[in-house]
């Protein structure tokens, strides 16, 4: 059974990293179900453009520039939502991918950048939202997982390990929030065709290993709008988590995408690989 129209009417939802790609699609999905959405990213211009776009689509939207690695920014984002009357849903979506290549030669500043966004940003969002939720006796916190959340991934250690951390962090929050009325969810959207996936930086000598990425995305990738839909089921139920790429979906989507011609070169996702200059 589908959701009743306007199932989120009267609720206020914050989505971090939401001025494009998956985050914007999540904000749109929530807004179409009646929620007032607060979008955020590190670019004030991008926030303004996203708010304007959502409003043109009939979504009640507000926004604020926010670097999730800065606690003060995240607190201000929370206050932006509370200024609209309430805070009911918080989605920690902001994420960063690292330079492709072995950990032994990964630039320290790049590893730190990924950890700052994926780990510290998720903690900050959870830290400011949960006290509000616990105080009012309800609320939905959603943390976004990713490739590596269930095991090691060679040559993507910063990103994969950070997502493994997000999974354990989320499962711990769920234990701590038991019987409080607060629901904590995890969402692994699978392969989403976004700018982050289509623009990759590689260490020298490893760029050739990315040649198959377009084929993988052609088989199992999906649009941001499709990837965002399961969010609605999470925030309207007690479901703990959603994982897109199960064995079943890999078979069914793979067959469907092959038949749809997604593996043809003309239909593949554009891929831009930048080789890191180590000179």
Predicted regions and their residues:
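Catalytic loop of short-chain dehydrogenase/reductase
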Residues: 140-165, 170-171, 175-178, 191-192
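C-terminal helical subdomain
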Residues: 186, 205-261
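Substrate-binding pocket helix/loop in short-chain dehydrogenase/reductase
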Residues: 101-103, 110-112
């Amino acid at each position: 059974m589908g959701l009743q129209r306007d199932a989120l009417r009267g609720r206020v939802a914050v989505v971090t990293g939401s001025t494009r790609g998956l985050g914007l699609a999540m904000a749109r999905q929530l807004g179409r179900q009646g929620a007032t959405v607060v979008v955020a990213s590190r670019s004030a211009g991008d926030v303004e453009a996203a708010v304007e776009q959502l409003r043109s689509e009939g979504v009640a939207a507000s926004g604020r520039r926010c670097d999730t690695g800065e606690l003060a920014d995240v607190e201000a984002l929370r206050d932006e939502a509370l200024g609209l009357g309430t805070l009911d849903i918080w989605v920690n979506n902001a994420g960063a991918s690292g330079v492709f290549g072995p950990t032994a030669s990964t630039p320290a500043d790049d590893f730190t950048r990924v950890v700052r966004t994926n780990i510290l940003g998720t903690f900050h969002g959870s830290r400011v939202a949960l006290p509000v939720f616990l105080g009012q006796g309800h609320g939905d916190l959603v943390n976004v997982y990713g490739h590596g959340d269930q095991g090691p991934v060679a040559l993507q250690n910063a990103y994969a390990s950070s997502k493994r951390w997000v999974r354990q962090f989320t499962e711990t929050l769920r234990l701590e929030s038991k019987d409080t009325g607060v629901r904590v969810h995890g969402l692994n959207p699978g392969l989403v065709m976004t700018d982050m996936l289509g623009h990759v930086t590689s260490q020298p000598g490893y760029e050739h290993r990315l040649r198959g990425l377009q084929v993988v995305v052609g088989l199992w990738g999906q649009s941001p709008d499709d990837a965002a839909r399961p969010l609605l089921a999470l925030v309207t139920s007690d479901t703990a988590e959603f994982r897109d790429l199960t064995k079943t979906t890999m078979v069914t989507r793979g067959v469907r995408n092959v038949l749809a011609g997604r593996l043809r070169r003309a239909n593949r996702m554009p891929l831009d690989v930048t080789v890191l200059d180590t000179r």
